[in-house]
Amino acid sequence: MASTSFFPPRPSSTLAEIASLTKATLVDASYAEHRITGLASLDEAGPMHLSFFENLRYSDELANTRAGACLVSERFEGRVPSHVAVLRARRPFHAFVAYARHLYSDALRPHTGIGAPGIAPTAVIHETAKLEDEVTVEPLAVIGPDVEIGSGTVIGAGAVIAAGVKIGRDCDIGAGSHLQHALIGNNVLMHPGCHIGQDGFGFIFAGQHTKVPQTGRVIIQHDVELGAGTTIDRGSLRDTVIGEGTKIDNQVQIGHNVTIGRHCVIAAKCGLAGSLTLGDNVALGAMVGINNHVMIGDGAQVAAMSGVKDSIPAGERWGGIFARPTRTWFREMLAVRRLAEGSGAETAARPDDDRDEGRG
């Protein structure tokens, strides 16, 4: 359940209010004034908690729950114990999240809670930097020359915003992050330790490996979220671009000249080599590695821990090392398993050889 010490909730709500906010139906109106003070999973919930159910895997937890109310679809409504108020919703988890966003709005942004709104006395801000009203700069952050920061943006403790960087409105730049050679849109969230705009990995690999100047930028469009420890290299000649609405998990490495489309989802520890392109709505599972100059089409999906060396057409699902269409991958894995099982059966049928003869 949510920790109220870290995430103080709003005042409690009645089930009638929750039904209105989530567009759910309160099945028994006699529960309309029952108050909910927090959220919890079915197995941890008490009489003042709201929970949800939409997966039969958790049937035992539902049967034994002490929750005060449960969001559930009409299909599973009859499984809810009689002492639990039923909120009927077409998509229970979506309704649960809608109320969670209302109750714990502070949890939606990577605030550290260090310092008060405004400019901390220990922050260092260059005289040529331009900050709109209602910008917060936390302790020990450094803002360089000619930086521009939009209203409502928070620069976390110890962050460094290098010369010429432009940051839009209502952004959160996590503690310890470092931004250079970058243009950042509105409502961009960066969790702690992001590094944006450093050199791309560009060398002439011969003899002493001659470094290639990296003179491009990083452009991050509106509504992008970057997980902790994510790094995005600036382009060499053209820009590295992260498209609007894309969500990137922790510890992802994005190489120089990469173009990522809109509303992509990239899970933790992916590595994207230079000059590749992701279309819109692409999904990458955790620890996917993609070769340089590859094109991943709109809506394509890549399974976790895959290695991609070839371009993937739009809308296809690929996986494996090296990645290929998932149906092909599954057939190959099944064939290998059958081959291994057959080989194991033959080995087990052979008489013991004499390699261990004489050992005690």
UniProtKB/Swiss-Prot annotation:
It comes from the Bacteria. GO terms for molecular function: N-acyltransferase activity. The keyword Transferase applies. It is an enzyme of class 2 (transferase). Gene3D superfamilies: Hexapeptide repeat proteins (2.160.10.10), MurE/MurF, N-terminal domain (3.40.1390.10). Residues 341-360 are annotated as: Disordered. The keyword Lipid biosynthesis applies. One of its GO terms (biological process) is lipid A biosynthetic process. GO terms for cellular component: membrane. It catalyses: a UDP-3-O-[(3R)-3-hydroxyacyl]-alpha-D-glucosamine + a (3R)-hydroxyacyl-[ACP] = a UDP-2-N,3-O-bis[(3R)-3-hydroxyacyl]-alpha-D-glucosamine + holo-[ACP] + H(+). Transmembrane segments: none annotated. InterPro entries: Hexapep, Hexapep_transf_CS, LpxD, Trimer_LpxA-like_sf, UDP_GlcNAc_AcTrfase_non-rep. Residues 349-360 have a biased composition (Basic and acidic residues). Pathway: Bacterial outer membrane biogenesis; LPS lipid A biosynthesis. Keywords: Acyltransferase, Lipid A biosynthesis, Lipid biosynthesis, Lipid metabolism, Repeat, Transferase. Its EC number is 2.3.1.191. The active site is at H256. Belongs to the transferase hexapeptide repeat family. LpxD subfamily. Catalyzes the N-acylation of UDP-3-O-acylglucosamine using 3-hydroxyacyl-ACP as the acyl donor. Is involved in the biosynthesis of lipid A, a phosphorylated glycolipid that anchors the lipopolysaccharide to the outer membrane of the cell. Homotrimer. This is UDP-3-O-acylglucosamine N-acyltransferase. It comes from Rhodopseudomonas palustris (strain TIE-1). The lineage of its organism: Bacteria, Pseudomonadati, Pseudomonadota, Alphaproteobacteria, Hyphomicrobiales.
